[in-house]
C-alpha cells in the first residue's frame, strides 16, 4: 500500500464510533493492552507525560514539548485531531512521523490490527508508542 491507501484503510476499514455508534465504545483498556503486549510494550521504553482534561490539552502538550525540546530532551508528541495531515498527530522533536513509517507500521501489523478490531484511536496510539520507542 502507498501512504494514501494506508490512510484510507485506517479511516475506513476499522470500526470507529462515528461510523457504528455505541457498539464501538470500549469501557476498558483491554484491546490497547493487547496490542501493546503484541508490540512488546513500546511505551515502557521511554518516559512520558500524559495530559488529560476537558480543554487545553493540545496547547499544553505543544508548550511542554517545546520546553522539553529546548532543554535538550528528545521529545515525542502525540495529539489529536490533526488539521491537515494525519502525521501531525505523531511527532518527534517537532518533526512529523514520515509517511513510510505510517505505511510500514500498518503493513507489518495489519493482520493483528484487524484481528483485534482496534478503534482508530487505539491503532494510532500504538503507532505513536512504537515510533517513539525506536
Residue ranges and their predicted role:
Residues 22-26, 34-37, 41-44, 70-134:
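ATP-dependent carboxylate-amine ligase catalytic core
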Residues 1-53, 60-62, 66-71, 78:
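Short functional linear segments
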Residues 56-57, 83:
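Short active-site-proximal "capping" loops at secondary-structure junctions
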